[in-house]
Amino acid sequence: MKGVISQVMGPVVDVDFNDYLPKINEAIEVFFEVEGKKHKLILEVAAHLGDNRVRTIAMDMSEGLTRGLEAKALGAPISVPVGEKVLGRIFNVVGDLIDEGEGINFDKHWSIHRDPPPFEEQSTKSEIFETGIKVVDLLAPYAKGGKVGLFGGAGVGKTVIIMELIHNVAFKHSGYSVFAGVGERTREGNDLYHEMKESNVLDKVALCYGQMNEPPGARNRIALTGLTMAEYFRDEMGLDVLMFIDNIFRFSQSGAEMSALLGRIPSAVGYQPTLASEMGKFQERITSTKKGSITSVQAVYVPADDLTDPAPATVFAHLDATTVLNRSIAEKGIYPAVDPLDSTSRMLDPQILGADHYKVARGVQAVLQKYKDLQDIIAILGMDELSEEDKLTVDRARKIERFLSQPFFVAEVFTGSPGKYVSLDENIAGFKGILEGKYDHLPEAAFYMVGNIDEALAKAEKLKA
């Protein structure tokens, strides 16, 4: 099972074997020294070149590797720790702890390359995954075991929404979450860890990081590492798990780098020829089974804001819902800055939600759309030139806009107001009341940063006083 390194080209390493040929995706271990420090490097077999030579992708920096070093085939793919012991810890792509905490003996390891659940084991029920976030549950609800795309520029609140979802899943559904940091900034990973620690959600989440400074192999496979941990919670413990991927674009980007290094002919815009099949293979593993579910929230970076770029376009094909964050909403001080007209969900269907929820959601969107259409007139002529009916629409739209804001548990530190979880029934009842004109007499300010409608009424009383 021992071989010898015959060529090193950055993250691509060729290994020669005598009487053994490792399978594709098998892990190979190399020990070497750099300036007196010992290093262990894991390689993953990507191609067979003939004559018992394999081409592999390095899962860590390959500086210091030399030809002639001994490499040992491990006889199996990369396997990572799974089970409740992984909660509250940070792992790298090969399942090593990187949080400088105390070591643990993990009793269970699973391979990161797994088949999706067989067709007959998958669940076909369409159920809503209640998040407790008003704007999401009302207008673009998440499917249990579905995939959600989270779109937004820098600094509009993607990470805060992710943390709030982790919090709500932990405290309301007593479920676990897995966070895979795929090719993002190390600083963000560090901040997320400390923010989670401060907001007491760390012991309900496993973190897997393969950051921007790492070679493409690590950035690509880290998504599989996180998914494997989530699959264990679903299949062996029967839980509904939340899986966060930040950022799914980097998964495709690192795949393109690996493909070029392996000498494959690129396809459109320089991406790998296997872009769609790699993405499909990954996304098919994220699903509901009869035992449990994995609901995934995937942050999507859109290169140069071009939605037709092959990487984001391939992701769209798999999404059940999109949550779009808008800077202009954040600038108004309305958080979460979710765009109620741009966010979509296949769950927004009377067959799934029931007539009442569907009617209220569509009513809210209609009022907000009308307000958007009237904004030019208001800017030029002012409110006084509008008809009485339009004035009422604008008044209700502004209340709805403010009522879509909500204080978050994980943001209590900055906002000073206690977080609120709003159940679906309270959520629908509140917006239904606004649409029916029950609260036309209340001031706009009463609806800002409150949970359910009772809190808005209480706030209105306070404002009167």
UniProtKB/Swiss-Prot annotation:
Q: How does it sit in the membrane?
A: Peripheral membrane protein
Subcellular localization is given as:
Cell inner membrane
| Gene3D superfamilies referenced in this protein's UniProt entry, alphabetically | 2.40.10.170, Bovine Mitochondrial F1-atpase, Atp Synthase Beta Chain, Chain D, domain 3, P-loop containing nucleotide triphosphate hydrolases
Reaction(s) catalysed (UniProt annotation):
ATP + H2O + 4 H(+)(in) = ADP + phosphate + 5 H(+)(out)
Keywords per UniProt: ATP synthesis, ATP-binding, Cell inner membrane, Cell membrane, CF(1), Hydrogen ion transport, Ion transport, Membrane, Nucleotide-binding, Translocase, Transport
Q: What InterPro entries is this protein classified in?
A: AAA+_ATPase (IPR003593), ATP-synt_VA_C (IPR055190), ATP_synth_F1_bsu (IPR005722), ATPase_a/bsu_AS (IPR020003), ATPase_alpha/beta_chains (IPR050053), ATPase_F1/V1/A1_a/bsu_N (IPR004100), ATPase_F1/V1/A1_a/bsu_N_sf (IPR036121), ATPase_F1/V1/A1_a/bsu_nucl-bd (IPR000194)
Give the top-level enzyme category. translocase
Locate the residues binding ATP.
152-159
Q: Example GO molecular function term? A: ATP binding
- CDD domains documented for this protein: ATP-synt_F1_beta_C, ATP-synt_F1_beta_N, F1-ATPase_beta_CD
Does Ion transport appear among the keywords?
A: yes
Major location (coarse) = membrane
Q: Which domain of life is it from?
A: Bacteria
Quote the EC number.
7.1.2.2
This protein's GO cellular component annotations are: plasma membrane; proton-transporting ATP synthase complex
Q: Which family does it belong to?
A: Belongs to the ATPase alpha/beta chains family.
On assembly, the entry states: F-type ATPases have 2 components, CF(1) - the catalytic core - and CF(0) - the membrane proton channel. CF(1) has five subunits: alpha(3), beta(3), gamma(1), delta(1), epsilon(1). CF(0) has three main subunits: a(1), b(2) and c(9-12). The alpha and beta chains form an alternating ring which encloses part of the gamma chain. CF(1) is attached to CF(0) by a central stalk formed by the gamma and epsilon chains, while a peripheral stalk is formed by the delta and b chains.
The record describes the protein's role as: Produces ATP from ADP in the presence of a proton gradient across the membrane. The catalytic sites are hosted primarily by the beta subunits.
PANTHER family documented for this protein: ATP SYNTHASE, ATP SYNTHASE SUBUNIT BETA, MITOCHONDRIAL
HAMAP family hit by this protein = ATP_synth_beta_bact
- What is the name of this protein? ATP synthase subunit beta
Q: Which organism is it from?
A: Campylobacter concisus (strain 13826)
* Gene, per the UniProt record: atpD
